């Protein structure tokens, strides 16, 4: 099912439909400031397992989307230096790797207690997380075509994944450049993958 949500004024009624789907262990596809992404509630172990299977790479790391930095600090260890980096660069097209706190369920973690965190500069993505009241587990929607790595058209995404997810949010054409990944678990920030933005 394709649900149209406009970024400049997200409809509360449509956001409620998205939240209800997520609270029923559903997976949704939603727009971000980089590429379209799968999302499910951090609280739903069942949905996290389904998301891993849907991606076909069960051991690949998943990322957690937050509404703001205060929410990040509830789930990750954030010292003053890390806080300053996050404040300068978020919201934005970054994935920061941080040490997870005990509030992050084991199902959402890999072998080490590190998670990727995102605060997208996209009003729909942040409105969904805020309305849900908890972070979302997320993973990029990849394209099977090796030339076009990320699918940007929500209608094509719905055709491809509509049967596998509860709904697809149509927030307009997406981007096809992924996030910049920065590891903040060491003494100095380390760029793991160059992406859409430069670290400030």
List the predicted regions and their residue ranges.
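Active-site-adjacent structural elements in enzyme catalytic cores
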Residues: 1-200
